[in-house]
């Protein structure tokens, strides 16, 4: 089977709470770092989540 181009990434909260989401991203079409505004349940607000590598 062929290996897919989608890579697993972690979206880390910029609020500094340590909360994160995991998702996949196509590295070929979106080489830049992903930034999304998502809900952080620790601070109970929508904050910016930035892409980080899964270790």
UniProtKB/Swiss-Prot annotation:
Gene Ontology biological process terms in this record: translation
Gene Ontology cellular component terms for the protein in this record: cytosolic large ribosomal subunit
- Gene3D superfamilies from the entry? Ribosomal protein L33
Known PROSITE patterns for this protein?
A: RIBOSOMAL_L33
Q: Name one Pfam family in it.
A: Ribosomal_L33
InterPro entries, alphabetized? Ribosomal_bL33, Ribosomal_bL33_CS, Ribosomal_bL33_sf, Ribosomal_zn-bd
Molecular functions per Gene Ontology: structural constituent of ribosome
What keywords were assigned to this record?
A: Ribonucleoprotein, Ribosomal protein
Q: What is this protein called?
A: Large ribosomal subunit protein bL33
The gene that this protein is the product of is rpmG
